[in-house]
Regions:
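Mature extracellular or lumenal effector domains of secreted proteins
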Residues: 1-125
Length: 125
């Protein structure tokens, strides 16, 4: 992910025939990178709400709130239904549905409200 002049990467080890098979059917597939690793993609400005932290492929709370094809969503409440923050690729939902790659964070996130649009790079081996 490139934000500003810096590109940052994380590695997700997942066996599949293709990236398409992991995301096309819309099924949630969990990964365990952790909040800090996802936040590192956007650098020191990364911000997420303190609860939920649902991460992986096809991550969705409710359709109008935060979602990500590949990424993490977080909430200020103890559930994952109304998440107002996200980091990832193929993202959308409330506060700025046009931010499809990067970090959106509102409603008491841990590093302040953020609106970071980034360029996404996905390398598949």
């Amino acid at each position: 992910m490139r934000s500003g002049s810096t590109a940052r990467f994380v590695v997700i080890h997942r066996n599949a025939n293709s990236l398409y098979t992991l995301i096309a059917d819309g099924t949630y597939r969990a990964v365990s990178l952790g909040r800090n690793k996802w936040k590192s993609l956007v650098g020191p400005e990364g911000s997420l709400q303190p609860n939920c932290s649902k991460e992986g492929f096809n991550v969705v709370g409710t359709s109008r709130h935060s979602k990500a094809r590949i990424g993490i969503i977080a909430n200020n409440e103890n559930d994952c239904l109304t998440c107002d923050s996200r980091i990832g690729y193929g993202t959308g939902g409330s506060h700025d549905d046009s931010n499809t790659c990067g970090n959106e964070a509102r409603v008491s996130p841990d590093n302040g409200d953020k609106h970071i649009k980034a360029m996404g790079y996905i390398l598949v081996q």
